Every structure is written in structure tokens, then in C-alpha cells.
Amino acid sequence: LKRVKAQGTFFIITSVLQGRLPSAHRVHVLLSHFSVAELIRLFHVFLKDFYPDLASQYRIDIKKRLTRRRLHEDIATANFKETLIVLPEDIKAQFLRYCFKKFNLDADEINRDIFIGEKEIWILKKDGLEIGSHTHNHYALDAISPSTFTGDIKLSAATLLNLTNQSPSVFSYPHGRLQEAVKPVLTEVGFKYAVTIERRGLKTDDDKFLIPHYD
């Protein structure tokens, strides 16, 4: 970016600065080590053992797509990810801890390896690059309550302000998901723009809180 004199925005999940590995990244780590068939089988065992009343509701179909999202992925992988996204956060976190313990994966070490820290963020800021918010906990904003996403967005913005001495003005939706009630919160917190995961060029009449972007 510096060589071609291009402006870039780095969206920070602020909980990683506290050493936390977000759920989505735990899923990516698991899928990079193990087959999706093995993980789905383990998920079904987990539900049967800990949440038998939810086992049928969250059973993962490997033949029919749950949504039209993730068409670039095979059905099993897409449905595994989509199911975990809508799973209640406490149950999702418990399942992922269960997997990491079973497979002897060190979340703290992985977090240090894959994410930049405060020093690197400062360098990016010093070099004139934009520091945006990707929330604090990287929750899918259409799957949690307004009180939860309001607190999460405010915490992320406050953390970045404290770190960079500047309030973030650009926001990126985790998983590209939102509900309409998120937009007023972004305005209240001081964000000027927000980007989705829609990959296309910008139009003059695009909503400033629904800007497509390439990453």
C-alpha cells in the first residue's frame, strides 16, 4: 500500500488485544486441521451430551444448503459455519473450547501468531492508514440482542480511541451480517461509514452504512 501510495483500512477485532481468539477464527483453525465431517460428528456428539433438547434443532444437514450464502463452499462446510453463526454465543463458545481441548490446540498461542498487536496498530496509524472497527467480540450482529451489540460496538470504539487517540470512523460488519437497528447505534457512536462483504463497485446512491468492498 505504501509503495503504490494507496489508502487502506485495517479493521480490528478489539478483543484479540486482550488475548482472546474469536469464535470465527477458532472455526477456521479447526477446519484447517480436521475434516468437516469429523467436526460435524463431534458437534452432534457435543449436543447429545450437553444439550440433548437442542440436538434436533441444530443438527447439520450435509445434503441440502441452509442458506444461499457461501455458495463457493461445499454444502457440509457451509452448513457447519452457518449453524455455528446462529448458535447461541455461550453454547458456541463452549463447543469450541471443547474442540480445542480435545485436539490440544492452544488458543493463546494461535492468537499471538495470527493477529497484530497494539504496537503494530500504532505503526499502521503512524503510516497514515485507517484503523476501523470490526467490533469487540466479532459476533454476528443479526444473531444477538440490541443491548448486546450496542455494548459491543461501544466497547470496540472506546478501545480503539484509547489506543490510537482517535475515534474510529469506519466499521466492518462481522460475517457481513446486521439488523437495521445496528445503524442508529453506529451513528450514535460516531461512525461515518460501514462496509459489508458484498464484492462490487461503489454506486452513488449506496447507503453509507452498507458500502460494498473488496478485501
Where do the PLM segments sit?
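Histidine/lysine/aspartate-rich catalytic loop segments that bind and position anionic ligands
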Residues: I116-T148
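Extended, charge-rich helix/loop segments that form flexible
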Residues: R20-D127
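C-terminal active-site subregion of NodB/CE4 polysaccharide deacetylases
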Residues: K2-G8, G19-A37, F50-L54, R70, ...
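Short beta-alpha junction loops
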Residues: I12-Q18
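Short beta-strand segments
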Residues: I12, F100, G132-T135, V170-H175
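A short alpha-helix capping/helix-coil boundary motif
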Residues: Y98-K101, H136-N137, L160-L163
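Residues that form or immediately flank small-molecule/cofactor binding pockets and catalytic motifs
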Residues: S15, H136, R199
